Amino acid sequence: MTRSYQKDLIVEEFKEFLEADGFLFKHGANHQEDCLKELADLVYVCYQYAENMHWFLDAALDRVHQSNMSKLGEDGKPIYREDGKVLKGPSYKPPDLSDLI
C-alpha cells in the first residue's frame, strides 16, 4: 500500500467519523456504536500508516500522553485558554520520539 493511498484512507475514515458524530449529535445516544466503529476504523488506518512507515505508534502515543500530562500548572490542574484548549504549563516537556523512527 502506498503512503498516498493510506493517507486517502485516513481522510476517508475521518470523513466517515465526522458523519457518524454529526448523526449522533442530531439523533442521540442510540447511535454511539456507529460513531465508535468509525473512530476505531480511523485509528486502525492510522496504525496501518505507522506500520508502513516502520513507526512505533503505541510508544509514541505513550510519550505524547506523558508530555500532555506535563502541561499541568503548578497546582496540578490544567491551564485553559478561553476556547478551552489546554495550554503548556511551567513543567511542560515535549515528547522525544527520535528513537522511534
Give the positions of each predicted feature.
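Flexible "arm" and connector segments at domain edges
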Residues: M1-L39, V43-I101
